[in-house]
């Protein structure tokens, strides 16, 4: 167990500030972070924050040369994958919580989502249909990213999916309005594997956005394992919006001590 574990849990979830949580990538860290879902669940009481835990949240690092690839497309696929991943989990947990009259409550959200629907696809009517379409889009971007960077395909067409794009900020804002939710979603991202640099920047874009009243990104990583703190536009996160840091263990102090060592020639 971590020292002051209960204090850490409250500090993480009872403030809407975006956070970087520094700690060794251990089973203990994952179990601690996952326990936040049980403490801050999706319930019919919409006055408290909701924790959503992800240990797989980005597109994988593919060791291949991307200098001839469309960088804008890679950023787009990374952003949309993360957006559909988070939205899918929100809807899945909402359906599982057995809300009454869910289709009626989310009717406005479904209507707004239909505006961005590919017109060659059927209109979305039910929450379960919306979740299915979100999952299809999520998987589409994951698979096509890998195929594109590996040269299996030369272009990515979104004609075959009903929902090619999702504004996550709009989705969560409208979801809260429909459900009369007064708090926010704490998106707990447990970095346990190597990510595409584009996915790292997609996360940074959300942290750099002023959306933490609705979506608060909380990244758990080893101190030297987050590839960059730059957003997709090249600017640093803190140049747009500040974030907090939490030390789960002694890893950050050990990292800082290492940085202070003199260079050995």
PLM ranges: what are they?
Residues 4-12:
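Pre-Walker A adenine-sensing motif
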Residues 12-13, 17-19, 25-179, 234-265:
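P-loop NTPase nucleotide-binding core
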Residues 24-26, 56-59, 190-200, 220-225, ...:
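An acidic- and aromatic-residue-enriched active-site/binding cleft used to recognize and process polar
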